[in-house]
């Protein structure tokens, strides 16, 4: 055993974990680029690619499950295997799914040979590629142009680079998926950093990573060409940076948080939701500093104010640049163009309770758990959220009995254990807040407000609730079935994973620890079953 430990330490000295994991992500991203961008490799029969993936994925998964159950694989190797599984899963999906499959508001591109300006995410990217500049038109005149430009600027430059290297235009646009594949891998690494920061290890860590590794929603986003995956990555960076600042309140960490929020808003405006829990954390800390200043003097107060001013300057200049630009040039406030009121997606005819209340049993429609765009088929926000989280907007009419049973089982397990995991997460944050209160009892006034444990629990708990509440408000403001898509709050998977990871560390009672273990096992089972179901209905489609 000591020999293995020594070997492990040597490997760790030779290759830091973060560098190794980033290398894995880059390897699979380049693999997807070559398989889609080099004509000879792109011509390999799809059956071969599908077959190889279908052999390797279960093997990797079984090794990981063996390590989770027996504990005979070291943590470093387990993390390595989970990242490999994630990237193989996402890379296979990108390679086996075309540019026009399962996209949202994709639009079209007509190529550099004409002067046509096209709508949709592809049109936005093509504009930058074709005209070598950002659009100077009113962003609400063409669909999808209202989005902030960061993702589209990166994508446009990527197409320019690939075509400049000699790649055919069609293949270059197909390889837009490589960027979102890269983002999905980096998202998992940031999730790992957050979980390690919170003290996660062992089965709790593995179950949380497995949720983010195999959850179908992240697989779908890894092959998308819109801005959702980059936005999700940057929100995760905000969470990571804020937790780092809570532990050590330095100006560089505060500015890193400001930059993450600013870039997130420059990717998608709904990143602003993270500002609410961040603002609460700042408020708690500043109130604690004010209490302390009665004994230590006002110097700390002025230092805090200076730091917050710099934070606001960096995050505001970067994050609000697009909003201010549209307001000055076109007198346009942020918003989303909506379909017509008589659209089949409109849910205006239904009451708020029918849309946002607890769904009736009939609303769940367990017999066919897929999302139909018509509000007559389904109009409850939470039902649509669960369906799109597993199967996106797939509607496989004529699906045979066996795949359908797999999907039904995954759907039921996801509802039961997903809800239980959400409750577990919130309960753990409350437990941490009460523990912080107990630790600081009898201390100086304001000690609780500056307690890292208390700030952490408030930041995470209110952050999760802010995303759920923001999601509900969004569906009220834009009352269409498409507004209830889980992709808008896919970062909630990270919060769920945090709850799963922390449960193995914080719950020591016999009953509570067993209950948490059942929830972790149930979430992992639902995730694995959902990924298998999606692979069957999306990739194989033998019927």
What is each model feature region?
Residues 91, 95-143, 150, 160-162, ...:
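Extracytosolic helix-loop segments that constitute the early lumenal/periplasmic catalytic or substrate-binding loops
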Residues 167-171, 191-214, 232:
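Transmembrane-helix signature of polytopic, membrane-embedded enzymes
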Residues 196-199, 238-253, 264, 286-289:
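Membrane-interface transmembrane helices that cradle and orient dolichyl/undecaprenyl
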Residues 241-247, 274-316, 340:
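Perimembrane helix-loop-helix junctions
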Residues 304-418:
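Membrane-lumen/periplasm interface segments of specific transmembrane helices
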Residues 1-96, 286-287, 300-314, 442-458, ...:
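Start-transfer (signal-anchor) and selected internal transmembrane alpha helices
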Residues 40-56, 170-184, 370-465, 493:
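Membrane-interface anchor segments at the N-terminal boundary of transmembrane helices
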Residues 65-67, 174-199, 237:
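Transmembrane-helix motifs of polytopic, lipid-linked glycan transferases
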């Amino acid at each position: 055993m000591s020999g293995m430990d020594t070997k492990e330490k040597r490997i760790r000295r030779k290759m830091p974990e973060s560098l190794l994991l980033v290398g894995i992500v880059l390897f699979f991203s380049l693999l997807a680029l070559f398989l889609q961008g080099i004509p000879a490799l792109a011509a390999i029969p799809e059956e071969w690619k599908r077959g190889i993936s279908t052999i390797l994925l279960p093997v990797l998964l079984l090794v990981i499950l063996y390590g989770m159950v027996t504990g005979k694989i070291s943590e470093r190797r387990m993390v390595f295997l989970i990242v490999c599984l994630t990237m193989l899963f996402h890379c296979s999906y990108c390679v086996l799914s075309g540019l026009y499959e399962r996209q949202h508001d994709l639009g079209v591109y007509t190529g550099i040979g004409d002067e046509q300006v096209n709508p949709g995410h592809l049109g936005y990217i093509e504009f930058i590629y074709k005209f070598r500049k950002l659009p100077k038109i009113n962003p609400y005149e063409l669909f999808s142009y209202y989005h902030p430009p960061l993702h589209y600027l990166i994508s446009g430059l990527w197409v320019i680079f690939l075509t400049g290297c000699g790649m055919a235009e069609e293949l270059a646009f197909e390889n837009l998926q490589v960027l979102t594949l890269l983002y999905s891998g980096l998202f998992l690494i940031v999730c790992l950093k957050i979980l390690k920061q919170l003290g996660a290890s062992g089965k709790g860590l593995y179950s949380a990573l497995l949720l983010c590794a195999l959850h179908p929603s992240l697989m779908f986003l890894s092959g998308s060409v819109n801005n959702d995956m980059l936005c999700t990555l940057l929100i995760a960076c905000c969470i990571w940076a804020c937790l780092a600042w809570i532990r050590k309140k330095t100006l560089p960490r505060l500015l890193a948080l400001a930059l993450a929020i600013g870039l997130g808003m420059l990717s998608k405006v709904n990143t602003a939701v993270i500002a609410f829990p961040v603002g609460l954390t700042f408020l708690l800390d500043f109130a604690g500093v004010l209490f302390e200043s009665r004994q230590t003097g006002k110097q700390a107060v002025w230092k805090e104010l200076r730091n917050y001013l710099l934070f606001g300057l960096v995050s505001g200049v970067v994050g609000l640049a697009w909003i201010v630009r549209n307001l000055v040039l076109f007198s346009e406030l942020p918003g989303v163009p909506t379909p017509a009121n008589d659209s089949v997606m409109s849910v205006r005819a239904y009451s708020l309770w029918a849309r946002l209340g607890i769904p009736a049993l009939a609303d769940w429609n367990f017999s066919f758990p897929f999302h139909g765009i018509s509000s007559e088929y389904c109009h409850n926000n939470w039902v649509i959220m669960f369906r799109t989280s597993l199967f996106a907007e797939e509607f496989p009419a004529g699906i045979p009995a066996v795949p359908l049973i797999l999907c039904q089982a995954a759907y039921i397990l996801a509802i039961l254990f997903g809800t239980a995991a959400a409750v577990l997460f919130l309960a753990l944050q409350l437990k941490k807040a009460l523990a912080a209160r107990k630790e600081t009892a009898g201390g100086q006034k304001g000690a609780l407000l500056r307690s890292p444990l208390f700030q952490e629990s408030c930041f995470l708990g209110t952050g999760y609730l802010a995303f759920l509440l923001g999601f509900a408000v969004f569906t009220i403001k834009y009352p269409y079935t498409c507004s209830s898509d889980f992709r808008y709050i896919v970062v909630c998977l990270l919060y769920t994973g945090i709850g799963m990871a922390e449960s193995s560390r914080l719950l020591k009672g016999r009953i509570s620890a067993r209950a948490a273990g059942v929830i972790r096992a149930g979430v992992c089972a639902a995730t694995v079953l959902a990924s298998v179901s999606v692979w069957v209905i999306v990739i194989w489609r033998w019927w």
